[in-house]
From Swiss-Prot:
Keyword NAD set for record: yes
Protein's GO biological process: toluene catabolic process
Organism of provenance: Ectopseudomonas mendocina
Regulation: Inhibited by Zn(2+) and Cu(2+).
Disruption phenotype: Cells lacking this gene show a complete loss of toluene-4-monooxygenase activity.
Domain of life: Bacteria
GO MF term list: toluene 4-monooxygenase activity
Family: Belongs to the TmoE/XamoE family.
Name of this chain's protein: Toluene-4-monooxygenase system, hydroxylase component subunit beta
Record's catalysed reaction(s): toluene + NADH + O2 + H(+) = 4-methylphenol + NAD(+) + H2O
E.C. designation(s): 1.14.13.236
Pathway the protein acts in: Xenobiotic degradation; toluene degradation
Entry's pH dependence statement: Optimum pH is 6.8.
Function statement: Component of the toluene-4-monooxygenase multicomponent enzyme system which catalyzes the O2- and NADH-dependent hydroxylation of toluene to form p-cresol. Also able to convert benzene to phenol, catechol, and 1,2,3-trihydroxybenzene by successive hydroxylations.
Length: 327
């Protein structure tokens, strides 16, 4: 009996088609999803098992289609190592803000009544950020390429970062204003306060967008632009007007994350639109989710201040969304 001798495969042979030495990003990011190898049975279980049926319906049969999702590249080419280096610097900056402003007794100098606005309009944001975290994690799990999943998992970590900042700031304010209800009534506000109900409805419904493409579009092309333009930026403006100089700086750090999310979302849309059929699919999902997002923004802005004209912020959300869709 003789055995045919085969030439051993090179390291990272699955990247050979690139015809160049793979970068660190390529090595740790590309073609890592083995669940895409067999469309009839994504996972090594019965093809009719609940998990396989889920992936076949909500990933493989998604109307958002491309012949090679693995060709998508994160424009920032972040990996776990570089992400941690970058965010370690950001977290050091945020912690230094907390320390310095605490030493200056900043919270005692805000305009009277601002603490109640923060209790009502800021501290419940941690529920919204947790929704963003869960939604990003779902897209990460369902995405058809590991380069997409990597972007989503880092976005998930960013959402946890935002949530942590909000919880920390809430407790810090409660030490100066123990009677403002900070850290005590956020769940009740999230569930019952009229100004939060649009956001709660939006996110509870968005978390049931099981198709991976619809989940991505509704989250990154509808929800997140609305949060940037109709929550973060109005909060910054209101904070400045109420002598709160810490919150705008904190939000600036979070907006850096949001800008990165917009960059990779824009790159993924550009990649998806290599298939012309995807244009109508993406536009259809945006039109489905935009009314909910607009109503959520209007309710929140009306709660934040009676002097705010929601229309201008909705227009900015539309402009940000359009910039992501422009390829």
């Amino acid at each position: 009996m003789s055995f045919e001798s085969k030439k051993p495969m090179r390291t990272w042979s699955h990247l050979a088609e690139m015809r160049k030495k793979p970068s660190e990003y390529d090595i740790v990011s590309r073609k890592l999803h083995y669940s895409t190898n067999n469309p009839d049975s994504p996972w090594e279980l019965s093809p009719d098992s609940p998990m396989n049926l889920w992936y076949k319906q909500y990933r493989n049969a998604s109307p958002l289609k491309h012949d090679n999702w693995d060709a998508f590249t994160d424009p920032d080419q972040l990996v776990y190592r570089t992400y941690n280096l970058m965010q370690d610097g950001q977290e050091s900056y945020v912690q230094s803000l907390f320390d310095q402003f605490n030493e200056r007794e900043h919270d005692q100098m805000v305009r009277e009544g601002w603490e109640h606005t923060m209790a009502r309009c800021y501290s419940p944001l941690r529920y919204l950020f947790h929704c963003l975290q869960m939604s990003s994690a779902y897209v990460q799990q369902m995405a058809p390429a590991s380069t997409i999943s990597n972007c989503c998992i880092l976005q998930t970590a960013d959402s946890l970062r935002w949530l942590t900042h909000t919880a920390y700031r809430t407790h810090e304010l409660s030490l100066t204003y123990p009677d403002a209800g900070l850290g005590e009534h956020e769940r009740e506000l999230w569930e019952k306060e009229p100004g939060w109900q649009g956001l709660r409805e939006l996110m509870e419904k968005q978390l049931t967008a099981f198709d991976w493409g619809e989940a991505f579009v509704s989250l990154n092309l509808v929800v997140k632009p609305m949060i940037v333009e109709s929550i973060f930026k109005p909060l910054q403006q209101q904070a400045w007007e109420n002598n709160d100089t810490l919150l705008p700086l904190l939000i600036d750090s979070q907006l850096k994350d949001a800008e990165r999310h917009s960059r990779w979302s824009k790159a993924l849309v550009k990649h998806a639109l290599e298939n012309p059929d995807n244009h109508a699919v993406i536009e259809g999902w945006i039109e489905k989710w935009r009314p909910l997002a607009d109503r959520a923004a209007e309710a929140y802005l009306s709660m934040l201040s009676s002097d705010i004209l929601p229309a201008q912020y909705l227009e900015r959300s539309t402009s940000l969304r359009a910039s992501i869709l422009t390829v």
